[in-house]
A protein has these predicted regions:
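Short, hydrophobic transmembrane alpha-helix segments
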Residues: 16-29
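Short, highly charged, low-complexity non-transmembrane loops/tails of multi-pass membrane proteins
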Residues: 181-200
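Membrane-proximal helix-loop-helix units in multi-pass membrane proteins
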Residues: 83-136
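Small-residue-rich transmembrane alpha-helices that serve as helix-helix interface/gating elements
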Residues: 156-175
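Loop-to-helix transition at the N-terminal end of transmembrane alpha-helices
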Residues: 26-43
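Hydrophobic alpha-helical transmembrane segments in multi-pass integral membrane proteins
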Residues: 136-156
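Juxtamembrane helix-capping/reentrant segments at transmembrane boundaries
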Residues: 56-77
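Core segments of transmembrane alpha-helices
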Residues: 7-14, 72-90, 133-142
């Protein structure tokens, strides 16, 4: 399976179509397109250049061997999650601002988790595969939320429930990934995480 390549082609096609046929984009639509592009770079940094992020997760979190087919398939699940996080706000974000807060929260989460991963995953250098693009995502996520707040876009409930939209989508993605791995549940993962932190 060429999940990463398929995701890249589809995402770039969408970005190209937007550039060709939509003359004026709102700030929120520009943000959605920008995040889509960032996610392409992030997936390649995690998976190929330099790559190795899945191997670190496999070793330190799952603590079990995964075949290459499962690894590649997991990226397809991740790609679907990213499509939801970028396409939905592109079309509906101006009407329902919480759909913008959700991917912004996702961007912030990515930036934080990759920094935490430096210590948790025990990397030899202060770097985890995907760190550079993740920090750009973090800045972008904070930036759009600040812009929305300053320009009074959305109500309090958009900022309150937007992160929960992200969490709901993220949990669905994780449950799908756990089902693909098979034989491992959240309790096992949490136990592995606790043991890993206890060993630090």
């Amino acid at each position: 399976m060429y999940a990463l390549e398929i995701y890249t082609v589809i995402a770039m096609l969408l970005i190209t179509l937007v550039a060709m046929f939509m003359n004026e984009l709102t700030v929120i639509q520009q943000f959605a397109v920008w995040v889509s592009f960032l996610c392409i770079l992030h997936e390649w940094e995690e998976g190929r250049y330099p790559g190795g992020f899945l191997d670190l997760i496999q070793k330190n979190v799952l603590q079990r061997d995964l075949d290459e087919e499962t690894k590649k398939g997991s990226r397809l699940v991740t790609a679907v999650f990213i499509y939801v996080m970028t396409i939905v706000p592109f079309f509906f974000g101006d009407q329902i601002p919480m759909f913008v807060v959700a991917p912004a929260t996702f961007c912030i989460f990515e930036g934080i988790i990759h920094v935490v991963g430096i210590k948790f995953l025990g990397t030899k250098k202060p770097y985890t595969p995907g760190l550079v693009t993740a920090e750009i995502e973090l800045v972008s996520g904070v930036g759009i939320i600040v812009w929305m707040a300053v320009n009074h876009v959305g109500a309090w409930y958009d900022y309150t429930f937007g992160p929960f939209v992200f969490i709901a989508c993220f949990v669905c993605m994780q449950r799908t990934l756990m089902a693909m791995v098979g034989g491992i549940g959240y309790k096992d993962v949490l136990a592995n995480v606790r043991r890993r932190f206890a060993a630090k």
